[in-house]
Amino acid sequence: MRSSPRLAAALLALLGSVASLPADPVTTPAALFTYMFDDGFSTDAVVSREFSEQGAVACSAVTTDWIGTRSHLSAAEIRGLQEAGWEILSHTRTHPHLPRLRAPRIEEELRLSREELEALGVRVRSLVYPYNQSNAAVERIARTYYRSARGGGYSFDTSATNPYALRSFSYSHDPEALRRTIDRAYAEKAWLIVYQHRVDVAVTIESRRGSFVPGEILEFSPSGSEALCQESAWSQIFGTLHFLPLTGSPRAGDLVTGQRSRASGKLGRIIFDDFAAIAGMLKYLRSRYPDMRIVTIDQGLDLLGIP
């Protein structure tokens, strides 16, 4: 039977309306962005204020044996991060190379770390592999206790990504490189996960006298600033100083003095400032890509339709 011209026109109109329907948001989501901090350093609690001020969230991957130790988060700080909208992830108990362990030990690391965090009143659904290392045996056990697990890989994630092999980029103190990676993720409508460890400021020190002590207060003159020393043996070798700003803004040329050690030196140049870089990154995302959602791992999995 031949179709009438009116029927053909109606069918074409119907097909055109179907073709113009929006794509399924689960299979073609807008770009997503997740920022993570590995190991549970106490600086997570400090930098969380910058995220809160800009209406953003992040994730902290906590190694439970380190909770409450020097330079690491306390139980109260971990709960505070969760209350601020951050997601807390397990990073095992002792931070081992999981693929080198036998199955019973892997199971113990993954199960007990989650139980210990939950005993603090923290909701835990995902894991971060120490050193970004896993294998089939590790993945199999991770599936028993977690919704997902993150490694490295320097590539983007999509709805097709294996949730127990989430990929990520390590932040290398290069804000320009990070912005270029954000640009690529947005263009590809991908999920970009970025991680780093401790947050601090690194500067060169000239005419150093004595050795600064980790944990001591540093005084900067004439700027009048104060900071918490995060010195290490490597800092001494390379002639640098790492610190956590407390008040003011230290400037090049300041005389730096340790309150306890009385060590001193002249502040040369700023090598990197993680706090300024994170603030700049969040402003860049908000201004350039307002529709690129800043999410936790759990939220990203939900938006991609990953169970």
Language model regions located:
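A Trp-anchored, charged/polar loop motif used as the substrate-binding/catalytic surface
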Residues: 172-183
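Bacterial N-terminal signal peptides that target proteins for export
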Residues: 1-9
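Sec/Tat signal peptide C-region and signal peptidase I cleavage site
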Residues: 19-22
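Autoprocessing Asn-cyclization modules and mimics
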Residues: 200-270
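Boundary/entry segment of secreted carbohydrate-active catalytic domains
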Residues: 24-46
